[in-house]
């Protein structure tokens, strides 16, 4: 991608939106977008700010998670182990990258305008140590690309920072080729240089699948790192065994003993690293005035420049002697989840004895390869490389053993690692003014990083970092020269191995190196000793920054985490919190090892927040000169060539802001031993306000002015149209899939609910059927049960009264049973007496469910007890005894019976007594219902009482002093006892009788005190003929027995299906016709045989003819009739039966067609005659009417008069009739009337005359108006013929033919009339042939009267047809005569004059003329009426007669006269 912006100090920074897509040979195209801004501070130090921009749907990661962005795992709160494992999985797709992607770092470093591709000058204070740049002239020629190197040759000139032009892939390949050619000659110089790789603060969620490619010269051969193979053993099986995969992360459970990074030089390493080393050296030489940043080590001030150079020279020589290649040394930098406050310091200690100091052994967590620093080192032993090659052929791992480490650490100090010159130069030039940039850009960042550069000992002293901070320390072993003292604090440390494969770490760390955004080193102001937290630590989410990129960060919650690679604010950038990446004196690359990664727990990290709180993402620092197994040589050369000119330092993390350009610095060998420490400080986020309050005084830049927060970044579109459409399609597809899923779920749930509903419904229906069956059985049993009320009182008082029972129903008459009474006496049970009021409580006349005899109560203490003999259900119907009829129905006004209690416990029931009517004998009424007695124990023989047949026991006497309440309906004080049954036996009629609703009186024989009544002595006679009585008074209806359900089901099953032979639609049509006929087939047959259209009209006959059975249908029906039985014929559907019966009429189709044609012919010939007659009448009217000629002559006169003096139009003898419709458009001068109005008025005034006979004859029988008109017009009587004006009278006639006739005549076409006549003639002949066929084929009994009627019709039809033909010919001749008579010519484009043209002209003119003629006739009538009235008034005025008015009320004669007149009129 081409750089398209220029960073100017006088303008706001220009933000650029970049999109980087990656070529993955085995996957889909992925990419990411970021916005970057390159700005300068007042010292011309450039730094870059980047924000990730999310476009379209999430990019599918390599872990087969379709909805997860490749970098999204950084934003999730996952343990570091899982993050690094995910990094390991991503390496499988990072083998082949496009060169164009790797060259995309130039975007951030190129300025626009007419600056000739040069970077702006960098104002850097460099040290004056001449020992640093002894071979600066030799380094200058090795800078691959950049105008910076050309500028570095002038050491007396202040180094400026300028952009370089982008280089095409061809140029890069050529440069790599050149470097390869001269790399062998200059390897000595390059081995003495330091190389630095900018690592990226990269989150897994934000980064796409990228990888860094290294130069071929940096590939490390033969087991350079011991931990790579060990880590490779724990790799997932699905990861390809690529060089990168072999260097992938292994198990986090490994101890830190695997951190030994030793190995021999690779024999196939490319010598092109010399050029890279020269670049690093040139970078140093161009920044001599940079003051060094002292290290926390005690030996920070004891390294001399000459010693470092000599050590570097010896290292280079030893490398050339071994294999002319340079190995690598890697320093673990750091890794952290986006929200994890972890601080790490990679610290390399120089031990004189080659010992390496390490931290605690507890920290063995995964570290990305970008967190390791690769330093070209000196000689290494190669005996461990064979071991690696045996395990993994073709893959060069970095392994080492303890003896190798010992030998390597004792290497002379001259073997100093080379450093990328351009990156060092950029690092030295990045002296930022934090306050200026933070306010100018509107960002509040809590990331600061200050880089220190090599300097002389006398120029600067280094302070220890603040002890208040916690950090991670990675001790880097190095070989110290003889003059350089070793730090005392590191001499006693153990030597564990590197926990991860460094090559894999590097390969997995910077997938966005092609983006080339600046890395921000994390300052480490903390104490170098802090406890390590748990290995799988969780990281807190950080609040979003109120900056320009906040909108972008807000798109995902994880983007709100502050990152240390942003713009450093004025308060956060302090010298105390620095990131130092220093080389070791004479340390071989393999002896330089990352000892330990210390993780600080969240509590410890949060407690250590000070003024320099820093939040750092995983900064994977990868020097361009990495020599790991997982990097191809060619790709690495491209990477080196790209990282060299990256003065702005690309931040490789989309969505985070970059700080100073380089993550850490590799100082030269000549520096103090304190510069061999790498501090990476990771602190939680701290708001800018806190740092503003705690940061000591920092000067703010006057220019450029600070950038307000409201200033919007001017960028282009963040997405392309194709991406937008792709996102829309993706969302639509997701929406559609979601809708389909919801619909499927809904249908499934509906199906389940319907199934459950059907199941519940079936169960309920089954329960209903069971209840119905139970109810039916119980109803059948209720007919044989009754209620039995038994008194259970023990006192047997003598009875002092008798009961008189009144029988109200034949069926309810109770017969006393002696057997029951005997059985009751034998059982010594005396029932209590019941109130007689309960005898009135009985069901309706037809109800037989409950029957209970009631018992009169003698006192308020007695109560009624009734029981049922069978076991009682919830609503038990008791069984009555065979000889006891049911009680009478309830009288009106009484409530229902109390429910019967169950059998075993005899429950007392106290019914409320009714109000007592006034009895003839004084009986004291009861005050209320008495309390019921306690229930007696169940009786063993109670169940046998109703059917025992024994007489009931005598009722006990009531207590003295109390009388029972009188029963309702009794006119005397007699009461009946339920224990005493009626005297008369029950009568059982042979059939149910109508009830006689009387009030029954029953007399008790044992009652002694009652007075004798009629009923005692009255004897009931015997009915002699009961059959007659039953016949007369029996019930009309009887209950029908219900049929069993089995029979009903059997009948339903036996119903046979109706047979259909026709198509469904056809059968429906015939069925509709049958339902609309309302006729029987006999009527239809008779109407057809007799040709009678009064019964079957023509429309019905036509419908029958159209819906008659076709041949195939008729064949099916006839075949079915022939092959089926009579029972099956009844099952045939009605449409089929109807068509079959219709087909039974002989020659139905021919007969129907003849009858239909007879009606059609009559209508057709009548229509033709009417049309011909209209044309003939219109033509003759125009030819023979004198008034038509008068009107045309009048128009001719007016036209010639109007055209007088005009030689072309005047003096006309005639005119074309086309002018007639246009006369109404000729207006008068005042527009009050037109020419047609004037013609009509003139005609009515002077032309409307007619001859009449004598005026008297003309005036006879006229009304007063005619008389007035006659008198006014003709005052003198004249006899004989005379001419007079009739205008305005009823005698006035319209002078033209009727306009409607002209309109109808215009619709006639002679061609159509001729066609209709010919059609009728053909149909007539065809119908005649059908008649002959009918007469030939039909039986003789069906010929008459069809034959006679049809023959007569055809004779008449032929005559009428001939007459209409002659009439049509006459009409045509008359029309042609009319056209010629008026001189009309055909229309333009037509050959003949058509009736429509001629008659439409006359129709329009006649319509206008008739409208005006009616109006003017009315006006003339009004004028003549006025004249007649004036004449009459004049005559009456001359003959005045005085008349006396008579008062009708005063004169008796007048009243009589009026009365007579009224009577006569009536």
UniProtKB/Swiss-Prot annotation:
<dbReference type="GO" id="GO:0060173">
    <property type="term" value="P:limb development"/>
</dbReference>
<feature type="region of interest" description="Disordered">
    <location>
        <begin position="559"/>
        <end position="598"/>
    </location>
</feature>
<keyword id="KW-0539">Nucleus</keyword>
<feature type="compositionally biased region" description="Pro residues">
    <location>
        <begin position="913"/>
        <end position="940"/>
    </location>
</feature>
<dbReference type="InterPro" id="IPR015425">
    <property type="entry name" value="FH2_Formin"/>
</dbReference>
<feature type="domain" description="FH1">
    <location>
        <begin position="870"/>
        <end position="970"/>
    </location>
</feature>
<feature type="region of interest" description="Disordered">
    <location>
        <begin position="1446"/>
        <end position="1466"/>
    </location>
</feature>
<feature type="compositionally biased region" description="Polar residues">
    <location>
        <begin position="574"/>
        <end position="598"/>
    </location>
</feature>
<dbReference type="GO" id="GO:0005634">
    <property type="term" value="C:nucleus"/>
</dbReference>
<dbReference type="InterPro" id="IPR042201">
    <property type="entry name" value="FH2_Formin_sf"/>
</dbReference>
<protein>
    <recommendedName>
        <fullName>Formin-1</fullName>
    </recommendedName>
</protein>
<dbReference type="GO" id="GO:0035136">
    <property type="term" value="P:forelimb morphogenesis"/>
</dbReference>
<dbReference type="GO" id="GO:0045010">
    <property type="term" value="P:actin nucleation"/>
</dbReference>
<dbReference type="GO" id="GO:0005912">
    <property type="term" value="C:adherens junction"/>
</dbReference>
<feature type="region of interest" description="Disordered">
    <location>
        <begin position="150"/>
        <end position="192"/>
    </location>
</feature>
<comment type="function">
    <text>Plays a role in the formation of adherens junction and the polymerization of linear actin cables.</text>
</comment>
<dbReference type="GO" id="GO:0015630">
    <property type="term" value="C:microtubule cytoskeleton"/>
</dbReference>
<feature type="region of interest" description="Disordered">
    <location>
        <begin position="224"/>
        <end position="329"/>
    </location>
</feature>
<dbReference type="GO" id="GO:0017124">
    <property type="term" value="F:SH3 domain binding"/>
</dbReference>
<feature type="compositionally biased region" description="Polar residues">
    <location>
        <begin position="283"/>
        <end position="298"/>
    </location>
</feature>
<dbReference type="GO" id="GO:0001822">
    <property type="term" value="P:kidney development"/>
</dbReference>
<keyword id="KW-0009">Actin-binding</keyword>
<feature type="compositionally biased region" description="Pro residues">
    <location>
        <begin position="522"/>
        <end position="531"/>
    </location>
</feature>
<dbReference type="GO" id="GO:0005884">
    <property type="term" value="C:actin filament"/>
</dbReference>
<feature type="compositionally biased region" description="Polar residues">
    <location>
        <begin position="857"/>
        <end position="867"/>
    </location>
</feature>
<keyword id="KW-1003">Cell membrane</keyword>
<feature type="region of interest" description="Microtubule-binding">
    <location>
        <begin position="1"/>
        <end position="624"/>
    </location>
</feature>
<feature type="region of interest" description="Mediates interaction with alpha-catenin">
    <location>
        <begin position="458"/>
        <end position="842"/>
    </location>
</feature>
<dbReference type="GO" id="GO:0030838">
    <property type="term" value="P:positive regulation of actin filament polymerization"/>
</dbReference>
<dbReference type="GO" id="GO:0072092">
    <property type="term" value="P:ureteric bud invasion"/>
</dbReference>
<dbReference type="GO" id="GO:0035137">
    <property type="term" value="P:hindlimb morphogenesis"/>
</dbReference>
<feature type="compositionally biased region" description="Basic and acidic residues">
    <location>
        <begin position="165"/>
        <end position="174"/>
    </location>
</feature>
<keyword id="KW-0963">Cytoplasm</keyword>
<feature type="compositionally biased region" description="Pro residues">
    <location>
        <begin position="949"/>
        <end position="969"/>
    </location>
</feature>
<feature type="region of interest" description="Disordered">
    <location>
        <begin position="913"/>
        <end position="989"/>
    </location>
</feature>
<feature type="coiled-coil region">
    <location>
        <begin position="722"/>
        <end position="786"/>
    </location>
</feature>
<dbReference type="GO" id="GO:0003779">
    <property type="term" value="F:actin binding"/>
</dbReference>
<feature type="region of interest" description="Disordered">
    <location>
        <begin position="377"/>
        <end position="413"/>
    </location>
</feature>
<dbReference type="GO" id="GO:0051894">
    <property type="term" value="P:positive regulation of focal adhesion assembly"/>
</dbReference>
<comment type="subunit">
    <text>Interacts with alpha-catenin and may interact with tubulin.</text>
</comment>
<dbReference type="InterPro" id="IPR001265">
    <property type="entry name" value="Formin_Cappuccino_subfam"/>
</dbReference>
<dbReference type="GO" id="GO:0005886">
    <property type="term" value="C:plasma membrane"/>
</dbReference>
């Amino acid at each position: 991608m081409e750089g398209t912006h220029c960073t100017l100090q006088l303008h706001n920074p220009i933000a650029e939106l970049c999109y980087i897509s990656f070529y993955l040979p085995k996957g889909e195209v992925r990419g990411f977008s970021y916005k970057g801004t390159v700005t300068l501070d007042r010292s011309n130090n450039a730094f870059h700010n980047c924000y990730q921009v999310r476009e379209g749907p999430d990019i599918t990661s390599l872990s087969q998670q379709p909805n997860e962005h490749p970098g999204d795992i950084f934003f999730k709160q996952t343990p570091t182990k899982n993050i690094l494992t995910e990094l390991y999985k991503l390496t499988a797709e990072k083998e082949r990258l496009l060169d164009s992607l790797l060259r995309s770092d130039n975007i951030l470093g190129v300025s626009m305008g007419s600056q000739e591709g040069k970077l702006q000058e960098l104002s850097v204070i460099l040290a004056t140590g001449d020992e640093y740049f002894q071979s600066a002239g030799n380094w200058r020629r090795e800078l691959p690309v950049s105008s910076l190197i050309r500028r570095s040759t002038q050491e007396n000139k202040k180094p400026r920072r300028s952009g370089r032009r982008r280089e095409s892939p061809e140029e890069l390949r050529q440069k790599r080729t050149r470097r390869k050619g001269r790399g062998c000659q200059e390897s000595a110089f390059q081995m003495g240089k330091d190389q630095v790789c900018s690592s990226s603060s990269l989150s897994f969620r934000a980064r796409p699948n990228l990888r860094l490619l290294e130069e071929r010269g940096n590939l490390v051969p033969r087991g350079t790192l011991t931990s790579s193979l060990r880590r490779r053993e724990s790799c997932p099986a699905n990861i390809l065994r690529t060089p990168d995969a072999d260097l992938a992360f292994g198990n986090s459970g490994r101890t830190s003993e695997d951190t030994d990074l030793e190995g021999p030089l690779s024999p196939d390493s490319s010598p092109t690293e010399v050029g890279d080393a020269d670049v690093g050296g040139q970078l140093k030489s161009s920044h001599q005035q940079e003051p060094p940043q002292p290290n926390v080590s005690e030996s920070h001030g004891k390294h001399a420049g000459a010693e470092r150079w000599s050590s570097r020279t010896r290292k280079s020589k030893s490398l050339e002697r071994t294999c002319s290649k340079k190995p690598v040394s890697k320093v673990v930098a750091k890794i952290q989840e986006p929200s994890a406050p972890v601080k790490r310091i990679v610290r390399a200690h120089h031990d004189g004895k080659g010992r390496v100091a390490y931290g605690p052994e507890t920290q063995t967590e995964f570290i990305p390869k970008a967190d390791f620093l690769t330093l070209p080192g000196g000689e290494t032993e190669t005996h461990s490389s064979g071991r690696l090659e045996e395990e993994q052929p073709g893959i060069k791992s970095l392994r080492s053993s303890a003896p190798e480490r010992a030998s390597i650490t004792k290497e002379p100090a001259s073997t100093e690692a080379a450093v990328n010159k351009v990156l060092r130069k950029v690092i030295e030039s990045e002296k930022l003014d934090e306050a200026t940039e933070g306010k100018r850009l509107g960002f509040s960042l809590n990331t600061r990083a200050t880089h220190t550069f090599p300097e002389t000992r006398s120029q600067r002293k280094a302070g220890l970092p603040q002890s208040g901070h916690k950090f991670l320390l990675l001790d880097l072993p190095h070989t110290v020269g003889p003059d350089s003292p070793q730090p005392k604090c590191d001499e006693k440390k153990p030597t564990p191995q590197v926990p991860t494969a460094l090559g894999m770490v590097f390969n997995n760390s910077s997938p966005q190196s092609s983006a080339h955004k600046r890395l921000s080193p994390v300052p480490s102001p903390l104490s170098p000793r802090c406890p390590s937290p748990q290995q799988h630590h969780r990281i807190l989410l950080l609040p979003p920054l109120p900056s320009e990129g906040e909108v972008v960060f807000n798109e995902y919650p994880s983007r709100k985490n502050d990152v240390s690679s942003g713009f450093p604010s004025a308060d956060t950038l302090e010298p105390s919190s620095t990131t130092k990446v220093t080389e070791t004196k004479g340390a071989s690359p393999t002896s330089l090892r990352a000892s330990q990664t210390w993780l600080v727990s969240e509590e410890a990290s949060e407690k250590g927040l000070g003024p320099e709180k820093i939040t750092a993402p995983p900064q994977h620092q990868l020097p361009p000169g990495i020599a790991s197994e997982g990097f191809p040589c060619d790709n690495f050369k491209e990477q080196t060539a790209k990282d060299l000119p990256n003065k702005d330092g690309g931040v490789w993390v989309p969505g985070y802001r970059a700080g100073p350009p380089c993550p850490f610095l590799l100082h030269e060998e000549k520096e103090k031993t304190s510069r061999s420490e790498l501090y990476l400080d990771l602190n939680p986020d701290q708001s800018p306000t806190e740092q503003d309050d705690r940061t000591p005084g920092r000067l703010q830049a006057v220019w450029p002015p600070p950038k307000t927060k409201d200033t919007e970044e001017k960028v282009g579109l963040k997405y392309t149209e194709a991406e937008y459409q792709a996102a829309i399609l993706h969302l639509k597809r997701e929406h559609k899939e979601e809708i389909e899923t919801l619909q499927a779920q809904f249908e499934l749930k509906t199906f389940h609910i319907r199934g459950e509903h059907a199941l519940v419904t079936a169960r309920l229906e089954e329960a209903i059927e069971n209840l119905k069956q139970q109810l039916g059985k119980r109803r059948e049993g209720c007919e044989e049960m009754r209620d039995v009320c038994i008194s259970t009182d023990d006192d047997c008082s003598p009875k002092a009264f008798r009961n008189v029972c009144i029988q109200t129903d034949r069926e309810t008459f109770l017969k006393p049973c002696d057997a029951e009474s005997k059985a009751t006496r034998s059982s010594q049970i005396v029932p209590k007496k019941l109130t007689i009021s309960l005898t009135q409580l009985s069901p309706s006349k037809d109800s037989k469910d409950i029957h209970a005899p009631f018992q009169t109560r003698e006192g308020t203490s007695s109560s009624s007890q009734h029981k049922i003999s069978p076991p009682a259900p919830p609503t038990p119907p008791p069984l009555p005894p065979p000889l006891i009829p049911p009680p009478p129905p309830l009288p009106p006004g009484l409530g229902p019976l109390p429910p019967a209690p169950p059998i075993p416990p005899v429950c007392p029931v106290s019914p409320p007594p009714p109000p007592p009517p006034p009895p003839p004998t004084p009986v004291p009424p009861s005050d209320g219902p008495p309390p019921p007695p306690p229930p007696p124990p169940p009786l063993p023989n109670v169940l046998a009482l109703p059917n025992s047949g024994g007489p009931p026991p005598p009722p006990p006497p009531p207590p003295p002093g109390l009388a029972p309440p009188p029963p309702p309906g009794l006119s005397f004080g007699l009461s009946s006892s339920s224990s005493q049954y009626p005297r008369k036996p029950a009568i059982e009629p042979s059939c149910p009788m109508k009830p006689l609703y009387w009030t029954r009186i029953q007399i008790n024989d044992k009652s002694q005190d009652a007075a004798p009544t009629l009923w005692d002595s009255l004897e009931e006679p015997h009915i002699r003929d009961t059959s007659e009585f039953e016949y007369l008074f029996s019930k009309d209806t009887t209950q029908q027995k219900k049929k069993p359900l089995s029979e009903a089901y059997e009948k339903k099953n036996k119903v046979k299906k109706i047979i259909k032979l026709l198509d469904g639609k056809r059968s429906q049509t015939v069925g509709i016709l049958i339902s609309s006929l309302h006729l029987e087939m006999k009527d239809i047959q008779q109407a057809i045989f007799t040709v009678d259209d009064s019964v079957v009209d023509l429309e019905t006959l036509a419908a029958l003819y159209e819906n008659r059975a076709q041949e195939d249908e008729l064949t099916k029906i006839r075949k079915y009739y022939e092959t089926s039985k009579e029972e099956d014929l009844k099952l045939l559907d009605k449409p089929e039966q109807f068509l079959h019966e219709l087909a039974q009429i002989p020659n139905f189709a021919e007969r129907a067609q003849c009858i239909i044609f007879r009606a059609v012919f009559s209508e057709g010939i009548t229509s033709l005659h009417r049309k011909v007659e209209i044309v003939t009448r219109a033509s003759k009217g125009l030819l023979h009417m004198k008034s038509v000629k008068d009107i045309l002559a009048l128009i001719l006169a007016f036209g010639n008069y109007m055209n007088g003096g005009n030689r072309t139009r005047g003096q006309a003898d005639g005119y074309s009739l086309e002018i007639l419709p246009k006369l109404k458009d000729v207006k008068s001068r005042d527009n009050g009337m037109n020419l047609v109005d004037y013609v009509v008025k003139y005609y009515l005034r002077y032309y409307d005359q007619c001859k009449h006979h004598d005026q008297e004859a003309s005036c006879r029988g006229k009304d007063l108006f005619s008389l007035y008109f006659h008198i006014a017009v003709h005052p003198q009587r004249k006899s004989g013929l005379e001419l007079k004006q009739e205008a305005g009278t009823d005698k006035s006639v319209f002078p033209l033919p009727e306009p409607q006739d002209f309109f109808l005549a215009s619709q006639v076409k002679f061609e159509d009339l001729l066609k209709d006549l010919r059609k009728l003639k053909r149909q007539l002949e065809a119908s005649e042939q059908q008649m002959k066929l009918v007469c030939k084929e039909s039986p003789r009994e069906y010929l008459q009267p069809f034959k006679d009627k049809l023959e007569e019709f055809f004779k008449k039809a032929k005559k009428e047809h001939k007459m209409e033909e002659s009439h049509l010919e006459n009409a045509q001749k008359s029309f042609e005569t009319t056209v010629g008579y008026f001189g009309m010519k055909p229309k333009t484009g037509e050959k003949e004059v058509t009736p429509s043209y001629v008659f439409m002209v006359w129709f329009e003119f006649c319509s206008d003329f008739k409208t005006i003629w009616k109006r003017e006739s009315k006006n003339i009538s009004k004028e003549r009426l006025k004249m007649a009235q004036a004449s009459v008034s004049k005559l009456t005025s001359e003959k005045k007669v005085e008349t006396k008015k008579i008062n009708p009320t005063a004169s008796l004669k007048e009243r009589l006269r009026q009365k007579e007149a009224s009577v006569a009129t009536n």
